[in-house]
Structures are given as C-alpha cells and as structure tokens.
Amino acid sequence: MPIIIDKDLPARKVLQEENIFVMTKERAETQDIRALKIAILNLMPTKQETEAQLLRLIGNTPLQLDVHLLHMESHLSRNVAQEHLTSFYKTFRDIENEKFDGLIITGAPVETLSFEEVDYWEELKRIMEYSKTNVTSTLHICWGAQAGLYHHYGVPKYPLKEKMFGVFEHEVREQHVKLLQGFDELFFAPHSRHTEVRENDIRGVKELTLLANSEEAGVHLVIGPEGRQVFALGHSEYSCDTLKQEYERDRQKGLNIDVPKNYFKHNNPNEKPLVRWRSHGNLLFSNWLNYYVYQETPYVL
C-alpha cells in the first residue's frame, strides 16, 4: 500500500527511485477507492486446486478484490463437475462487454500440441485481444505465458527432450523494474513443462524485457510495455504438494518421470518437499497487483 508524504520531503525522490509507492497528500485526499475487478481464466483441469492457489496469493494484500472466474466455452471440462462451473464460473461471452483491472490466464496441460491444435485456441485469441483494450494488466502463467508471447509477439515454443520438472534457482536481470521490488538477486520458482521459450527470441522483440531467468530452467519472467502484459513461465503459485502430486500421478500412469529436482529433502521422494519459493511467489503477485493494477487502473473502468 502507498505511504502518504509531503511532496517536498527530500526522501521522496530516493523512495521513488527505489520503486517504493509514495503518494502526495493532495493525491490521497482526492483519491477514490473501490474494489479491483480481477478475472481468472482457469485453463487447468484441476480447477478447484488452481482456484485455491491463486486466490491464496492475490488475497494476501490489503487490496479489496472482486474476483470473476472464467472457463472456456469451446472446451468440455471433464475433470470438474458441471455444477461447479455453472455455480461459480462465467464464459467470455458473459463478460466481453465489461472491463477489468486485472486478468490472470493460467497454464494448461496442452503444451505438446501446437497452439492452433488446441480446441479452444480461437476463443483464447479473442480473449487475449480483448485484454489489450479492456484490461489494465494481464498476468500469463506457464502455458498461458507461452500462448500470450506467441499470440502478441510471435515468440515460438520449442519441445524439450526431458520435462522441466522441479524447483530452480533464478537470477534477477532487471533489478529496478517494479515487478521485482523486494526480490533477492537469486530466488527459486517451480517449473513443470515439456516446452520452452528461448531467451534469444525474447531479446529479439524490442517491446519485451527479460526480468529473470535460470541457467537450468531458462526464461521465467518477462514483461511487456508499461506492464500491460506480464509473463511467468514458472509456477510461483504452486502449493507445497503440487509437484509431489504431479509426480505421483505420472508414476501411477506408468510414465517415465524423474523425481522433481531440488524439491524433496535430500532429493528423496519419501521425504517431505522443501518449499523455497513461497515468499517470492507472494511478492510476484502482490507487486503485480500493486504496481501494475492498483496504481495504474482508472477509478471508472
């Protein structure tokens, strides 16, 4: 939340240079405050689990949020009861004439398909186009980030020889960008994907800025102009047991899956997971909400 100080206080310039949110008394006295409208486009089959993960993070701020859950009308969800979707979700057609302060587009287990092979690709493209003029800032996660980078900037994805699976160390590349306010220079984030986007392709698009990457896991955080689009290739929203559940699920299916790296204590799946990403996950979501949604959105959408 902002701190209110005199506009002539010498510390103001220093704080602003450090991306500390300061507000003059004049602005504070005239500021209107309302709940922020946040849409979550949930593409995951485990919808209720994903809901809890994201709501836990975006709810960890002093901001009041009015959350709208969305699902794809052009896709039949087989892993969630229709009653749940009917009761708690809307479709794009339901909200396309509204505006939102923020939009989160989740990952989806469709990355081995080309984008055009995904059955809801045309609908997703319409939503991503809509977000450019009707949403203050959109946060794309994992496959959602790959889809956004491809649709908006033509950045391709590439198959990996082995699944990127585990918790990896990342390095901050742009320390003074507000999204990374409070981040350590090195931080951890989970990844769980069969494809990647490449650093050279990101750096080849002048509108994009690479914020954080990993020697082993590659690109993690990317931002577009003015923070209108944020892309997170990892899963900072994951709960403690999510990678464990994915590992056990794939083993039960008889798939050749390695133990997630840097995740279990002593890398032993019989021991408990070590959570090393929670604090930076909270920072990522709170910084996005604070700096790119709350501070930038108009009072009247």
Swiss-Prot record:
CDD domains: GATase1_HTS (cd03131)
InterPro entries: Class_I_gatase-like, HST_MetA, MetA_family
Keywords of this entry: Acyltransferase, Amino-acid biosynthesis, Cytoplasm, Methionine biosynthesis, Transferase
Domain of life (superkingdom): Bacteria
Disulfide bonds: none
Any single biological process term in GO: L-methionine biosynthetic process from homoserine via O-succinyl-L-homoserine and cystathionine
Gene3D superfamilies, sorted: 3.40.50.880
Protein's cellular compartments: Cytoplasm
Site residues (Important for substrate specificity), renumbered to this chain: S192
Site feature: Important for acyl-CoA specificity: E111
A GO-annotated cellular component: cytoplasm
GO molecular function: homoserine O-acetyltransferase activity; homoserine O-succinyltransferase activity
Positions that bind substrate: K163, S192, R249
Listed Pfam families: HTS (PF04204)
Catalytic activity: L-homoserine + acetyl-CoA = O-acetyl-L-homoserine + CoA
Record carries keyword Ribosomal protein: no
EC top class, as a word: transferase
Keyword Membrane attributed: no
HAMAP family assigned: MetA_acyltransf
Family as reported in the entry's similarity comment: Belongs to the MetA family.
Name by which UniProt lists this protein: Homoserine O-acetyltransferase
Source organism (scientific name): Bacillus thuringiensis (strain Al Hakam)
Classification of source organism: Bacteria, Bacillati, Bacillota, Bacilli, Bacillales
